[in-house]
Amino acid sequence: DEPPQTPWDRVKDLVTVYVE
């Protein structure tokens, strides 16, 4: 089951891009 898209997912994506 896939968890619902949450704002935190977006934040994690942004953080990942920023960190790299």
From Swiss-Prot:
It is found in: Secreted. Keywords: Cholesterol metabolism, HDL, Lipid metabolism, Lipid transport, Oxidation, Secreted, Steroid metabolism, Sterol metabolism, Transport. Participates in the reverse transport of cholesterol from tissues to the liver for excretion by promoting cholesterol efflux from tissues and by acting as a cofactor for the lecithin cholesterol acyltransferase (LCAT). As part of the SPAP complex, activates spermatozoa motility. Residues 1-20 are annotated as: Disordered. Its main location: secreted. GO terms for biological process: cholesterol metabolic process; lipid transport; positive regulation of cholesterol efflux; positive regulation of phagocytosis; positive regulation of phospholipid efflux; protein stabilization. Major protein of plasma HDL, also found in chylomicrons. GO terms for cellular component: high-density lipoprotein particle. It comes from Erythrocebus patas. Homodimer. Interacts with APOA1BP and CLU. Component of a sperm activating protein complex (SPAP), consisting of APOA1, an immunoglobulin heavy chain, an immunoglobulin light chain and albumin. Interacts with NDRG1. Interacts with SCGB3A2. Interacts with NAXE and YJEFN3. GO terms for molecular function: protein homodimerization activity. The keyword Oxidoreductase does not apply. This is Apolipoprotein A-I. It comes from the Eukaryota. Belongs to the apolipoprotein A1/A4/E family.
